[in-house]
Amino acid sequence: MFIMRLFSSTSLILLLSFGSLLADQIYISPDKNIQERFQETLILAKPGDEIILAAGIYEFTDGLSLDVDDIKLSGAGHDKTILSFTNQITGAQGLLVTSDNVILKDFAIEDTKGDAIKVKGSNGIYFINIRTEWTGGPKSTNGAYGLYPVESKNVLIDGCIAIGASDAGIYVGQSENIIVRNSRAEYNVAGIEIENSNNADVYNNLTTHNTGGILIFDLPDLPKQGGHTIRVFDNQSIQNDTPNFAPEGNIVGEVPRGTGIIVMASENVEIFNNEIGNNATVNLAVVAGEDSDDPNYQKFPKRIQIHNNQFGPVGFDPDERGALGPILVEIASENIPDIMWDGILPFWQYLLGQPADEKLVIDSNGDATFINLDAFWYVVLPYFHQPETDIDVFSGNISPLPAVQLVFPD
């Protein structure tokens, strides 16, 4: 038995070593045949290969796809290696990745017809120093998403830039074990969006000049629901002032211009040590999701902790878009506060009270102001409506959430 185990272990080591010896470095430079040559390289690559893109502008007319595990695709820098899709005719995105343990590093994708980089069903996807951009500025005809991992695990987005997406610059959906850090999102409808996902850390990012800076959403009618355990910390969500340019019918089309952070229908979210200010409508909002026929959808946010944030000017030019804007302006009038909760609860909780472990906790945010819109009673009994503005009512002990653990690439 010992000999068999030794033989098996030795065979595995030799196999891994042999596999690494077979791995290639494949060098690509731009030329007139780059569409066919690059796609062929992506198809024929072997696990362990590194595809290295030289500096230059690569022009494509069709989308690209990668379905090989353990691949590193790297350029010379997001300002030097540029994959341009300005003349794209076909393809739903610039690059589609459907494999595991893929590193995308040091290049840019510009002006795709649809999403810039979509990743689906990957376990181990690492975006490092990637830029996605629609260079013509904010337009509803821009692609929806810049960086777009969905239905994936172990997602790292580090040092990236996302500009001009008509939905979200950086979007992670229906995924788990996520880190978004050291990145910049600007001139998108949503800068960073974590949707229907769990175990996410969003930190040390700058979201500015978007319609809304950071969105933590849970939506109905999706295979994965119940987004939870998300930390948003050490970010700047400032001066988000771009008018909403989402195509009609998109959920983010409801986001008012000038929103810092929104949490909708998620649970176990901790927001701390952020700088949130110069947002014309609201700095931080916690709201329920919309009614849905989906029996699995839980639309009420739970266990949201907001602490140790620094707030700046707010509400100086509110946008009355969607369901949030008009009611906020009408109730708060000219005194729009830093933190807004719509106050919507399951009906039985209005009668019996909210469980302690589901309550909103707001603590140690300096001179931050607050309003509970108490929107249900505003609609049902408007003449007796009394919004709550005492922030101390929501103070309490903070229960820190655990850090996300990923295995990082070399």
Residue ranges and their predicted role:
Residues I3-L14:
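Sec-dependent signal peptide recognition
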Residues F18-G19:
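N-terminal signal peptide c-region/cleavage motif recognized by signal peptidases
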Residues D24-E36, E50, D70-G114, G136:
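Right-handed parallel beta-helix/beta-spiral solenoid domain characteristic of secreted/periplasmic
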Residues Q35-Q39, T61, F85-L95, D111-K118, ...:
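Extracellular beta-strand/beta-solenoid scaffold signature
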Residues E36-L44, E59-V68, L73, S84, ...:
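Short, T/G/N/S-enriched strand-turn elements that build extracellular solenoid repeat scaffolds
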Residues A76-D79, D100-D111, N123-G136, K153-S166, ...:
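Right-handed parallel beta-helix
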Residues K299-D410:
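Acidic, glycine- and Ser/Thr-rich low-complexity intrinsically disordered tracts
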